[in-house]
Amino acid sequence: MSKEEKLAIAAATDGACSGNPGPGGWGALIRFQDGSEIEFGGNSPETTNNRMELQAALFILEKLKNIKFAPSLTIKTDSKYLIDGMDKWMPNWKKKGWKTASGKPVLNQDLWKALDHPELPKIKLQYVKGHSGEKDNDRVDAIAVAFSKGRKIQLKDFANN
């Protein structure tokens, strides 16, 4: 079965930062109906944990543009910042010219605007408590931390599932 034929049924993202700001990393995964999964990660030398959370979500949404996914698919995240930004704050930020309720410029505006791009799929975010034993969240956390610390970590892809 090729990547294009697989049906994505779950996704998860996380961000981490060693110091805040400091070196950061993000992790993401997509789980497929056939039991396979694919993992991704990246880093930035000087960033914040919130930027890494947003970067992970943006990356996974970009990937899901080109993958068939179940209508029930959600993206699991332990970031209330990401969830509240997408679900509660963004409409008001846009109305106010990307300013907060106090009139200050929205932080991480470049990433928020990218997440709001109309070509990205609209997928529900699902809050999961971090470090709680939730398998996908624990895995993307391990990926994010490894990337933030410059450690090597084996990422699953279609060749090594």
UniProtKB/Swiss-Prot annotation:
Keywords: Cytoplasm, Endonuclease, Hydrolase, Magnesium, Metal-binding, Nuclease. It comes from the Bacteria. It is found in: Cytoplasm. Pfam families: RNase_H (PF00075). Mg(2+) 1 binds at D14, E53, D78. It catalyses: Endonucleolytic cleavage to 5'-phosphomonoester. GO terms for biological process: DNA replication, removal of RNA primer. InterPro entries: RNase_H, RNaseH-like_sf, RNaseH_domain, RNaseH_sf, RNaseHI. This is Ribonuclease H. It comes from Prochlorococcus marinus (strain NATL2A).
